[in-house]
Amino acid sequence: TAESSLDAAETGHLVFTTLHANSSCTSLTRLLDMDVPKYKLNSTVRGVLAQRLLRKVCTGCGIKRPISEIDARETGILKNTQIMYANKLTAEEKYNRKKEGTLCAKCQGVGYKGRIGAYELLLLDRKITNALSDGMTTKEVEQLAVEQNSMLTLRDYGLELVKDNLTTISEVKRVCSSE
């Protein structure tokens, strides 16, 4: 159970465990929802790592072009930045391209090939543990971690991967939504 893991941590053991949650901050809320005492959480948890796998844009058929105005506004990526867009084909387009011999050999028209990790590390320091003790919401704790500790959220990490031309904005939106 969650509490027995924290009991082991209190005795000096290094404990790694898995918890299903949407972000590192919601993991803490999940533990509190499991009736783990706040004092135990504050005294034993040092950090929480959230991770997601994003599909990598295909290097064989991905399209590099300037970011759209809408995407730039939604993401904060500079307007003229060149980013990759997936060349996803419909079933009919795949069939026709296969017949013509022009279907991408790397991804078979999916637009993506392989996966890459996106990570969010929340380090629990005095500010964060005090915020939890004070009953701050998950969003408020996340905002505090971003502002005070320079934490990158899953979405922000994903957008860095977009800037590095490793994935697409639509993939980050699909996988790293905060709801």
Region roles according to the model:
Residues 1-179:
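Short, flexible helix-loop junctions that flank or precede catalytic/ligand sites
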